[in-house]
């Protein structure tokens, strides 16, 4: 069978159609590659954005955790100190239950670790009290010119009042420590000190020369210091014994426990 020769025009048309088909196919392939590249780029961009958001969340969470730790550190320190210093049934010379006065009869020695840096020339006379339900009345005797101070710390470790020789003199004084939101009448001659928190630490210190004679004189002053609820003021009062919690670590320094 004899093939017919295509005319020049037919050949040209056929070539044009072939080129057009090839061009369209190439164009389709390019479009597909471009779309795939775009999709991949968008996917990678979303992944980078998600990773950045996750990193930002982690950084924010870490920053909040650090700020929370710093913010709460005083509260935790005070609470841990209170637990250790009051975890006894009765005053034992270096610790006392809530509402009882701890009357240290000698200078703190090197083994004393309830506070970080105790004074070495004063006798501590301290108590932890709860004024969330009713005021507590603090009575101080005439110190007869002796240097003494009774800082009152709230639950944040902030000192909100400091009766003592420099601020209020050394004559006999009586104070009502009241909690947040309390209002009411106080006995005549009683000065009100408002605490920002229900927990208060009275960290009293009385100067002592360290001689046997001066120890005896300061002991007599310590014995005249008292704290009682407002409802018991002017009446016989014995504070309730403490409850001992065996789970509390009484050996490790408070600072080390808080920082652990």
Locations of regions flagged by a protein language model:
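Bacterial N-terminal signal peptides that target proteins for export
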Residues: 2-10
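Bacterial N-terminal signal peptides
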Residues: 10-18
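Bacterial signal peptide processing site
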Residues: 22-25
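A compositional/structural signature for long, glycine/proline-rich flexible linkers
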Residues: 30-260
């Amino acid at each position: 069978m004899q093939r017919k020769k295509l005319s020049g025009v037919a050949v040209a048309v056929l070539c044009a159609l072939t080129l057009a088909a090839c061009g369209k196919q190439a164009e389709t392939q390019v479009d597909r590659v471009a779309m795939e590249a775009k999709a991949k780029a968008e996917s990678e961009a979303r992944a980078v954005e998600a990773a950045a958001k996750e990193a930002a969340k982690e950084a924010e969470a870490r920053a909040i955790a650090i700020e929370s730790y710093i913010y709460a550190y005083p509260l935790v320190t005070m609470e841990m100190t209170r637990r250790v210093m009051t975890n006894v049934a009765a005053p034992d010379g270096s610790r006392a239950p809530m509402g009882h006065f701890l009357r240290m009869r000698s200078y703190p020695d090197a083994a004393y670790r309830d506070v970080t840096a105790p004074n070495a020339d004063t006798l501590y006379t301290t108590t932890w009290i709860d004024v969330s339900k009713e005021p507590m009345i603090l009575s101080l005797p005439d110190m007869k010119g002796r240097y003494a101070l009774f800082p009152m710390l709230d639950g944040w470790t902030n000192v909100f009042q400091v009766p003592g020789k420099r601020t209020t003199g050394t004559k006999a004084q009586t104070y009502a420590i009241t909690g947040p939101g309390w209002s009411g009448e106080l006995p005549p001659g009683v000065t009100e000190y408002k605490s920002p928190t229900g927990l208060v630490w009275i960290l009293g210190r009385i100067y002592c020369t360290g001689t046997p004679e001066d120890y005896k004189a300061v002991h007599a002053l310590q014995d005249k210091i008292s704290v009682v609820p407002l409802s018991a003021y002017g009446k016989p009062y014995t504070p309730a014994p403490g409850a001992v919690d065996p789970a509390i670590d009484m050996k490790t320094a408070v600072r080390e426990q808080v920082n652990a």
